[in-house]
Amino acid sequence: MTGRGDPARDMEAARAIARQAAALGGRAYYVGGFVRDRLLGRENTDVDIEVHGLTPSQLEEILDGLGGRLEMGASFGIYGLKGYGLDIAMPRRERAIGRGHRDFDVTVDPFLGTEQAARRRDFTINALMEDVLTGRVLDHFHGVRDLRRGVLRHVDDRTFPEDPLRVLRGAQFAARFGFTAAPETIALCRGIDLSALPPERVEGELRKALLQAERPSLFFETLRDM
C-alpha cells in the first residue's frame, strides 16, 4: 500500500477519478476494509478504490492527468497517485500456484463483473463495494447482514483455502471486532495447512490482534477453534 495521507483528500481524489472513469463508461468503487469500517462507524485511513470498465491505458491516462501515477504493481493492476495515499486497483482474478501466501497467478480483467471481482476477497465483511459517486453499496455475499450480526464468514469455499494466511486474518478480525466465526468457516479453516506461512506474516497478524483488537484473547480463542 502507499503511504497514507489525509483520507478526506484521498476521497476527493477518488471522486475525481470516478468522474473521469464514468465519462468513459467505467465505474469506481470503494472496496475492502474501507467500506467495512465506514458501515461500522469506525475510522479507516486506508482508502482503496477499484476501477471497472476501463483499459489499463485509460486508467493510467486519468491518473497522469491528476498529477501522475505511481506504479505500485502495474502488472497486477495496482496504482497510486502522486501526493495521495489511496490505492487504485483494477479488477483481477487470483489463483494460488505456491504454498504459504507466497505465489499467486494474477490476471487483470478490467471488465470482470463486480460479483466475480468481490469473490476473491476473504470474508463477506471485506467483500463489500461502494460506488464512489452514488454511495450505493454492492453486497453480493450478504456482508452487511454479517456485519450487523457480528459474524465472520468466508466468501468462497474454493478460493478461501488457497491463502492459508486467511485463517490468521480471520482470528485477527474476530478479535478486532468482537465477531464470531461462522461454523462453516471454522470447519473450512481446520483443513488448511499453515505450516508454510512465512514467519513475518504470522507476526504481522499477531501484532494487529494485540494492538488493534477490542479483545486480544479472542485471537487465540478463535485460532484454537480453527
Regions found by a protein language model. Name each.
Residues 1-226:
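Catalytic cores of the polymerase beta-like nucleotidyltransferase superfamily
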